[in-house]
């Protein structure tokens, strides 16, 4: 019994010694109470571009020539994706809360590139030289946010005349059927304007053949009273009625009805 009590006391001795010596450890207070970094300190960690006000000068510098040469900024960029088929849309943005994601797009990876309507040499790299169409985002690899900025900057540069674009003049290869076909031609004038001409040409009188007339005469020999000729050129015109005759007919009308 005494041996078991002695063993338990010996087992607890090192733990007690640790607690007794814990007051000798000095913990620095600055590790526990730290000041939160201000916004200015966090922003200062992000590299500031010296070409922010004049972004076109960076494309003329030696640093740009050594890095890109004569190729576009998106020429050597490759997207990271799972599988062999890349997604149809790029990421929304590459910079979130002043932190750059892994493998950023060609514009976000270089902090000295700025999308501006005055930076014509950069905008020309994202426009097809033959058709003038802006390259879509999966082709160049830029994120959706930068692609939207590029589209707005290109349109603004075209409005200011900084970015030249050609509007081709295409001549019609086929004939113009707006006035050549009879169904879409101008409406002919009224019959009253053209004397003796019908509204449509097939309404005009056509003399039947003599052979057909002789056959009909033999067929209806006992029933024909008189032969009718062509219709008159114009209907007989009624003489104009005087106001007195018109009033008399108006008065006799109700009496005859009675």
Curated annotation (Swiss-Prot):
Where is region (Disordered) located? 214-258
User: Partners and quaternary state?
Assistant: Component of the mitochondrial small ribosomal subunit (mt-SSU). Mature mammalian 55S mitochondrial ribosomes consist of a small (28S) and a large (39S) subunit. The 28S small subunit contains a 12S ribosomal RNA (12S mt-rRNA) and 30 different proteins. The 39S large subunit contains a 16S rRNA (16S mt-rRNA), a copy of mitochondrial valine transfer RNA (mt-tRNA(Val)), which plays an integral structural role, and 52 different proteins. mS40 has a zinc binding site.
Main localization (coarse): mitochondrion
State the family named in the UniProt similarity comment for this chain: Belongs to the bacterial ribosomal protein bS18 family. Mitochondrion-specific ribosomal protein mS40 subfamily.
Q: What name has this protein been given in UniProt?
A: Small ribosomal subunit protein mS40
Q: Which GO terms describe its cellular component?
A: cell junction; mitochondrial inner membrane; mitochondrial small ribosomal subunit; mitochondrion; nucleoplasm
The places in or outside the cell where this protein is found are: Mitochondrion
* Keyword list, A-Z: Mitochondrion, Phosphoprotein, Ribonucleoprotein, Ribosomal protein, Transit peptide
From start to end residue, where is composition biased (Pro residues)? 229-242
- Modified residue annotations for Phosphoserine: 38, 49
């Amino acid at each position: 019994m005494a041996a078991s009590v002695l063993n338990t006391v010996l087992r607890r001795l090192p733990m007690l010694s640790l607690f007794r010596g814990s007051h000798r450890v000095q913990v620095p207070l600055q590790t526990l109470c730290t000041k939160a970094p201000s916004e200015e300190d966090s922003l200062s960690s992000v590299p500031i571009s010296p070409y922010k006000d004049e972004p076109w000068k960076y494309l003329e510098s030696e640093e740009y020539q050594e890095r890109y040469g004569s190729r576009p900024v998106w020429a050597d960029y490759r997207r990271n994706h799972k599988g062999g088929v890349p997604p149809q849309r790029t990421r929304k943005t590459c910079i979130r809360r002043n932190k750059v994601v892994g493998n950023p797009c060609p514009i976000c990876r270089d902090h000295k590139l700025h999308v501006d309507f005055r930076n014509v040499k950069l905008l020309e790299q994202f426009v097809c030289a033959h058709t003038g169409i802006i390259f879509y985002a999966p082709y160049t690899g830029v994120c959706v946010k930068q692609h939207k900025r590029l589209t707005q900057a290109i349109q603004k540069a075209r409005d200011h005349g900084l970015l030249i674009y050609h509007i081709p003049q295409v001549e019609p290869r086929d004939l113009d059927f707006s006035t050549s076909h009879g169904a879409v031609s101008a409406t002919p004038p009224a019959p009253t304007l053209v004397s003796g001409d019908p509204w449509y040409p097939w309404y005009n009188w056509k003399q039947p053949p003599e052979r057909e007339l002789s056959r009909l005469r033999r067929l209806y020999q006992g029933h024909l009273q008189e032969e009718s000729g062509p219709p008159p050129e114009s209907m007989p015109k009624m003489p104009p009625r005087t106001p007195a005759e018109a009033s008399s007919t108006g008065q006799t009308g109700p009496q005859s009805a009675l």
